[in-house]
Amino acid sequence: MDVQGELAQGKALDVWQAAVDSGSDTHVHGGAKAEMLEGSELVVITAGVPRKPGQSRQDVLSTNLPILDSIMADIKHHAPTATVLVVSNPVDVLTYRAWSVSGQGRDKVFGQAGVLDTARMKCFIAEQTGFSARDITALVLGGHGDSMVPLMRYCQIGSVPLSHFLSSEQIEQIVERTRKGGGEILGLKKTGSACDAPGVAIAQMVDAIANGRNRILPAVAILEGEYGRTDIAMGVPCVLAEKGLARIIELPLDAQEQAMFDHSADQVARDIAEMKAL
């Protein structure tokens, strides 16, 4: 769905035709009418204006907030029990907003950020070490922005700690590049933000939910005391299953990691307060 109905129809037709050659019999439809949501079990929200070079994700809040509110009203009317996956930026704030107006539990409304941030970090680790990205495990928590918290002691290559291969200085460079990964792409493309990697990240989460795979993936979830925080949406490791977000996994953090997480949470809390004031 898109406010530009014919654009959505064209993209849907293109995807449908691509799916045929991959052996899929799924029919793909597009349009602008909210009635298309009727009976949906899972809705992914990506609508909104992209940020421009030099802007933060929070800079597009005033524009994207009313867009999200309109979509949530349509979802509540046509698919009130649907699981909602928020991707629009600023994703932490908009996930919180979507949950707060949905009338549903946190298991049914959550966001995508950490899967993408983790993929970026794995890409940079593979580039730096020369090893296959398939053998790299990584984890990113916190807000989706410069305050995100890559947990480097959980990063491994083929079950070997990352610190065995890279110096602390090299690891810190990867951390900083991961935090600014979206901005790097935005600066290079000039006229648009990342789309392919976010699309793959969304597909992973949708697959986990639609097929009940019980996958552990980072998601922007509403915290209810986990990691010492409440009434906030933050990126944390979650179990995604058939009904949505089955549970949050609370990892033990050392003092430095907890301090970084708290710093990130404080920033997200300020952003949410700004949203409430609009």
Swiss-Prot record:
<dbReference type="InterPro" id="IPR001557">
    <property type="entry name" value="L-lactate/malate_DH"/>
</dbReference>
<dbReference type="InterPro" id="IPR001236">
    <property type="entry name" value="Lactate/malate_DH_N"/>
</dbReference>
<dbReference type="InterPro" id="IPR011275">
    <property type="entry name" value="Malate_DH_type3"/>
</dbReference>
<comment type="similarity">
    <text>Belongs to the LDH/MDH superfamily.</text>
</comment>
<feature type="binding site">
    <location>
        <position position="120"/>
    </location>
    <ligand>
        <name>substrate</name>
    </ligand>
</feature>
<feature type="binding site">
    <location>
        <position position="89"/>
    </location>
    <ligand>
        <name>substrate</name>
    </ligand>
</feature>
<dbReference type="InterPro" id="IPR022383">
    <property type="entry name" value="Lactate/malate_DH_C"/>
</dbReference>
<dbReference type="GO" id="GO:0004459">
    <property type="term" value="F:L-lactate dehydrogenase activity"/>
</dbReference>
<feature type="binding site">
    <location>
        <position position="64"/>
    </location>
    <ligand>
        <name>NAD(+)</name>
    </ligand>
</feature>
<dbReference type="GO" id="GO:0006099">
    <property type="term" value="P:tricarboxylic acid cycle"/>
</dbReference>
<dbReference type="GO" id="GO:0006089">
    <property type="term" value="P:lactate metabolic process"/>
</dbReference>
<dbReference type="GO" id="GO:0030060">
    <property type="term" value="F:L-malate dehydrogenase (NAD+) activity"/>
</dbReference>
<protein>
    <recommendedName>
        <fullName>Probable malate dehydrogenase</fullName>
        <ecNumber>1.1.1.37</ecNumber>
    </recommendedName>
</protein>
<feature type="binding site">
    <location>
        <position position="57"/>
    </location>
    <ligand>
        <name>substrate</name>
    </ligand>
</feature>
<feature type="binding site">
    <location>
        <begin position="87"/>
        <end position="89"/>
    </location>
    <ligand>
        <name>NAD(+)</name>
    </ligand>
</feature>
<keyword id="KW-0520">NAD</keyword>
<keyword id="KW-0560">Oxidoreductase</keyword>
<dbReference type="InterPro" id="IPR015955">
    <property type="entry name" value="Lactate_DH/Glyco_Ohase_4_C"/>
</dbReference>
<keyword id="KW-0816">Tricarboxylic acid cycle</keyword>
<feature type="binding site">
    <location>
        <position position="51"/>
    </location>
    <ligand>
        <name>substrate</name>
    </ligand>
</feature>
<dbReference type="InterPro" id="IPR036291">
    <property type="entry name" value="NAD(P)-bd_dom_sf"/>
</dbReference>
<dbReference type="Pfam" id="PF02866">
    <property type="entry name" value="Ldh_1_C"/>
</dbReference>
<dbReference type="Pfam" id="PF00056">
    <property type="entry name" value="Ldh_1_N"/>
</dbReference>
<comment type="function">
    <text>Catalyzes the reversible oxidation of malate to oxaloacetate.</text>
</comment>
<feature type="active site" description="Proton acceptor">
    <location>
        <position position="144"/>
    </location>
</feature>
